[in-house]
Amino acid sequence: VNKFIAYLAKQFACKEALSKAFGTGIRKPILFKELEILRDEKGKPYFNPLGDVKKTIINLGITKTHVSLADESEHAIAFAILEI
């Protein structure tokens, strides 16, 4: 699998994991375009909430978020933890 496809698969898996951690799946107020996954200078992924997702985090009292991504051959997996 090409590296760009693996990257996209991990991004998608992470957004799905985050939506499940919120308990809603992908539907208002949790939208794909507002679940931004970035990398720090060492390549570690982190979640940057945007728009209504950011407001939801504040309203729910979420203090920390954690994401982990991995891929192997044709599979991608992601975990998301939201701390209150």
Go through each PLM region and give its residues:
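Core catalytic alpha/beta fold that binds nucleotide/phospho-ligands
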Residues: V1-I84
